């Protein structure tokens, strides 16, 4: 993408890492290279979007890492970070926000981290005409926090973090008795006294159940894994899964009757 040579006769002959890290000329060179890379990338996105998209999957982790490490680089690249959606199209953050507004969840961007594991949720989203972006690299967990900080009012939420209103059938049916009965049953069978159970009428009658985990709890768990705190109990941070049962599904109806 970018080739060249930088001539700097003022660099010290001592090339030890500690000396170079504290050298003013090295810092200037680093800033200059960062600027040239950002200029090249933004220019390509403006004038040759097709080529930019072709390279994106390979260079995205490095660009996102650069945004996390260098504030000036992040400012230059903010409008040129692109996200692949469920149809394989690349969208800027502004495109994602415009699409979210059209779908009725303004400022809320849904994302997928594993297309196979979350296929059921993806199918439910597609059936309601909703879209999501694919963020499956390890760095994406930290990057979406960065994107939310730099873009006021923007929030990212994984598609299995909660049940959206678009997926519910607001029939007005009282499900209190069903919820109480199924909560007692599943807590006993699964031996989880604190299990949260919700019973909803879902539009998709083929889905019997879903398990959701709040975005905040998921990010806390991701942070624990990142910093090697896997031995700690996630429940100490208040993050617990919620079991959602579809009252329209024959299996759930059978359990209620029997």
Language-model regions, residue ranges each:
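Conserved GHKL (Bergerat-fold) ATPase module
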Residues: 1-258
């Amino acid at each position: 993408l970018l080739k060249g040579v930088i001539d700097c006769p003022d660099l010290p002959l001592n090339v030890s890492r500690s000396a170079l890290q504290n050298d003013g000329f090295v810092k200037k060179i680093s800033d200059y290279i960062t600027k040239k890379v950002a200029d090249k990338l933004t220019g390509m996105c403006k004038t040759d979007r097709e080529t930019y998209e072709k390279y994106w999957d390979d260079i995205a982790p490095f660009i996102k890492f650069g945004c996390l490490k260098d504030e000036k680089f992040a400012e230059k690249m903010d409008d040129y970070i692109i996200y692949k959606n469920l149809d394989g199209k690349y969208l800027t953050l502004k495109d994602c926000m415009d699409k979210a507004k059209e779908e009725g969840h303004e400022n809320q961007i849904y994302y997928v981290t594993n297309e196979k594991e979350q296929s059921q949720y993806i199918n439910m989203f597609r059936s309601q005409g909703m879209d999501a972006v694919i963020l499956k690299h390890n760095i994406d967990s930290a990057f979406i926090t960065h994107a939310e900080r730099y873009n006021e009012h923007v929030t990212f939420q994984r598609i299995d973090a909660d049940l959206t209103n678009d997926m519910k059938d607001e029939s007005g049916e009282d499900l209190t008795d069903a919820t109480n009965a199924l909560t007692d049953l599943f807590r006993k069978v699964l031996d989880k006294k604190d299990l949260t159970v919700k019973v909803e009428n879902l539009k998709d009658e083929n889905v019997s159940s879903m398990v959701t985990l709040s975005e905040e709890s998921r990010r806390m768990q991701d942070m624990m894994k990142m910093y090697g705190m896997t031995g700690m109990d996630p429940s100490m941070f208040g993050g617990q899964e919620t079991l959602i049962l579809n009252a329209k599904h024959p299996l759930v109806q059978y359990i209620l009757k029997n």
